UniProtKB/Swiss-Prot annotation:
Quaternary structure, from the entry: Homohexameric ring arranged as a trimer of dimers.
PROSITE patterns according to UniProt: RIBONUCLEASE_PH
Any one biological process term the GO annotation gives: tRNA processing
Pfam families per record: RNase_PH, RNase_PH_C
Residues annotated to bind phosphate: 86, 124-126
Signal peptide segment: none
Protein name: Ribonuclease PH
Family: Belongs to the RNase PH family.
Length: 238
């Protein structure tokens, strides 16, 4: 039995609140149960130095957690003067995931930065960030299209969503919350496109190694869950 009472293949309630920020070109408050992340997309008319005069743009991401996003207050990383390894890993994952469905040539020599700020954490912050970041990116591109800068359908090739799966109490489960994640035997994150293409899989056995059969089950759970998330994205932008 899962602590939340959910079935093994049941995700938490997911919601998207678009245009949460009045300043950003695109923004979305995404909620996966009690995990809440604010995703904002900011447009700059410049590219990183290595892309100058290439005709290509860039999509990148930054990730952070508010000090009291968790049970006990965390020290701000800015106060220590450097980002932690986990933060760097997650923000690179978000950027890679989004770029997988963006035609950088069609974007032109511009940069879109997605900021993912975790307001409240209860497991799955990176997967919620990726899923919400796609909405923020979409709205940023729609903002650009309204000013005749780009055509969204040429720049954005597909949806991107992500979900966690793992083995908890010897059962393969989807969308782990903190209680499950902190004691899971196996923890994995899946990032996939709307068409079912695999962008990234991160999987770790926390205790006992997992079998190929168990991995296949997790993959099946993730595929179904991501299809559900993509459908929710489509409903949100309709």
């Amino acid at each position: 039995m899962r602590p939340s009472g959910r079935k093994t293949d049941q995700m938490r309630k997911v919601s998207f609140e678009r245009n949460f920020s009045k300043h950003a070109e695109g923004s979305c408050l995404v909620k996966f149960g009690d995990t809440h992340v604010l995703c904002t997309a900011s447009l700059e008319e410049k590219t990183p130095p290595w892309l100058r005069n290439s005709g290509k743009g860039w999509v990148t991401a930054e990730y952070g957690m508010l000090p009291r996003a968790t049970g006990e207050r965390m020290k701000r990383e800015a106060a220590s003067g450097k980002q932690g390894g986990r933060t760097q890993e997650i923000q690179r994952l978000i950027g890679r995931s989004l770029r997988a469905v963006v035609d950088l040539k069609e974007l032109g020599e511009r940069q879109i930065t997605i900021d993912c700020d975790v307001i409240q954490a209860d497991g799955g912050t990176r997967t919620a960030s990726i899923t919400g970041a796609w909405i923020a990116l979409y709205d940023c591109l729609k903002w650009m299209e309204s000013r005749n800068m780009i055509k969204v359908e040429r720049v954005l090739k597909d949806h991107i969503a992500a979900i966690s799966c793992g083995i908890f109490a010897s059962q393969p489960v989807i969308d782990l919350d903190y209680l499950e994640d902190s004691s899971a035997e196996t923890d994995a994150n899946f990032v996939m496109t709307g068409k079912g293409g695999i962008v990234e899989i991160q999987g770790t056995a926390e205790g006992t190694p997992f079998s190929e059969e168990e991995f296949t089950t997790l993959m099946h759970l993730a595929k179904n869950g991501i299809a559900e998330l993509v459908e929710l994205q489509k409903q949100a932008i309709a």
